[in-house]
Amino acid sequence: MMLTIDIDTARRFILGKQGLWPGRRWRGMEGTEQAMRAMEYLQLDPLQIIARSHDIALHSRVLDYTPGMWEDVTYRQRTFFDWGGWLAARPMDELPHWRVVMRRERESNSRMRSIARDHADTIAEMRAILRERGTVSNRDFAMATRTRTQSYRGRKDSALALYYLWLTGKVMTHHRERFERVYALTETVAPAHLIR
């Protein structure tokens, strides 16, 4: 038997599922986490014209939301992690499922295999530096000391190596500075039971 609903009910259901109806119902830091969980996938926007789109999306759902609250629940509380070509914050407890996709990027993505082959020494160097320092940003490496690349992902071999390690799940975003990723080895960011 097919269930029939009217358009208003369907609209309210869809808006309610995304946290947009009936109005902003969450509040503060806890509400930010609840809204992000309801959205399931918060696309992060590096561009800021008036405000970053992820802050606008959360402001429309969370009372008392201020820009950057998503960073607290993502990077300080480690409730979410960011990842992917369409950069998004995802619930940390979903990491085991995403690690399958990360492994697929490493094994099946021809661009990633090409980066791994062409920049193997730099990738190994970045992993060693991360083991030594704990965290690292691409800005930590001056252009004068790096090999220039022709990739839209970065002008330096260090940028390409860090991007490769991040997309294939070997490193994660530890935190951000002026929206730029500061990387750390995955085992120092994610709870151990999620990366076995």
Regions found by a protein language model. Give the residues of each.
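Long, low-complexity intrinsically disordered regions
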Residues: 1-196
